[in-house]
Every structure is written in structure tokens, then in C-alpha cells.
Amino acid sequence: MAGQNARLNVVPTVTMLGVMKARLVGATRGHALLKKKSDALTVQFRALLKKIVTAKESMGDMMKTSSFALTEVKYVAGDNVKHVVLENVKEATLKVRSRTENIAGVKLPKFDHFSEGETKNDLTGLARGGQQVRACRVAYVKAIEVLVELASLQTSFLTLDEAIKTTNRRVNALENVVKPKLENTISYIKGELDELEREDFFRLKKIQGYKRREVERQAANAKEFAEEMVLEDISMQRGISINAARNFLVGGAEKDSDIIF
């Protein structure tokens, strides 16, 4: 399990936050698809296992039957029948070809048997044991068919087993490493952006307070300047000092406040 502090080394920006969210969405979708693929491969894996068990049981019976048939041929036609059969065979009539089958994106090798050409040993053992020779041939053909099927199943089984292990490793990596790391990175970026937002808000409040105080100071200076100008006008008009003009102005303001409307 990835640690709580495991994250990607990124610059905490809004753009990077969008990139990390997109990567998390992609990782989540990939995890879901790989999980479905693993489940599908597991189902196929179990089905192959059942077929292999059945094929092995059938192979045992077939090999037993073919061995008994060969023993019967040797008893009836003699040990020489093997050389007679080999002399009449120039090329194999039962052959095997390979192909691939795609299951959930995994290519599984398959083997198929087929007959090609004519059998040249139909008259083998005509003097004695001909019926037993044909029965032995049929028994061994069936045994070969079962062996080919078993080889195909076991090869597909091993390939599928490796594919399931690889898929499960990817699922675990996405679930326990990639997704937690992306989630931690997103949480880190959000925390840093929130901190930057708080700092910007505090800085803005300080600037607003400074501007407000500056406006108040300028207003006070303007008011003081206006009062000075009024006092100078009164002083010049009445020929009195600035202090006398200030007292005159204050006294006039007090008389105005006593007037009752």
C-alpha cells in the first residue's frame, strides 16, 4: 500500500490539477477494464482446467485401449507386423496444425489434427490379424486426437495463467500505487491552491485597508487645507490673525448650533 505522503513531484497550479484529475480518471477506467479482463480470463482459466481434467481422464482410457489393441495385434499377427506397417507407410496421414485464438485480448495457441492423403496399409495383415491391425490403428488415431487436444489445452492453460498474473499485477499496481499517488497529488495541489487563495485574500484585505487609510488621510488633509484656506480668507477680509479667524469661525458655528428651527 502506498504511503499517505507518496505523491508526484509537480508544481501546484490549476492546470496541473486538471492534468492530475484527467490522469486519475484514466487510471480508474483502466483499472476497471483490467479488472473485467482479469475476471473474464479467470472464467476461461477455470473452464480450461475442467477440460484438461476431462481430457487427461479420457487420455488414460484411450492409451489403455490402444495398448491392449497393440498387444492383441502382436499376439495374432506376430511381432513382425510392426515392420510390415512401417514399410507400407511413406508419409503421415494424420497431421497437426497450429492456430491462435483471441480471448479478451490474449492470443492462445491452439492445435488441430487433420487427415491428409490416403492410408496405404489397408491390406496390412491380410494373411492374419488384419482386423486387429485396423482396430489398433483406429485406437491409436483416437489416442492421438486426445493427445493433440490435451496439448492444445495445456498450452492455452499456461499462456492464460501467465496472462492472468500479468493482468493482476497491473490491476494491483493501479489500485495500490498509481491511483493513491494521483489522489495524494490532487489533495496536495488542492491544499496548496487553498493556501494561495487564503494568502491572496489576506493580501487583498491588507491592500484594501491601506487604500482606505490613504483615502481617509487624503480626505483629512484636504479638509485641513480647505479650513486653512477659509481661515486665510477670513483673516484677510477682516484684517485679523489666523487664530482670531479660527475663534471667529468656531464661535459662528456654535451660534448656528443654538438656532432652533
UniProtKB/Swiss-Prot annotation:
Modified residue annotations for Phosphoserine: 241
Domain of life: Eukaryota
Cleaved signal peptide residues: none
Positions of disulphide bridges: none
Main location: membrane
Membrane topology: Peripheral membrane protein
Keyword annotations: Hydrogen ion transport, Ion transport, Membrane, Phosphoprotein, Transport, Vacuole
InterPro entries on file: V_ATPase_D (IPR002699)
Cellular component annotations (GO), alphabetically ordered: cytosol; Golgi apparatus; plant-type vacuole; plasma membrane; vacuolar membrane; vacuole
Transmembrane segments: none
NCBIfam families attached to this UniProt entry: V_ATPase_subD
Family affiliation: Belongs to the V-ATPase D subunit family.
Record's protein name: V-type proton ATPase subunit D
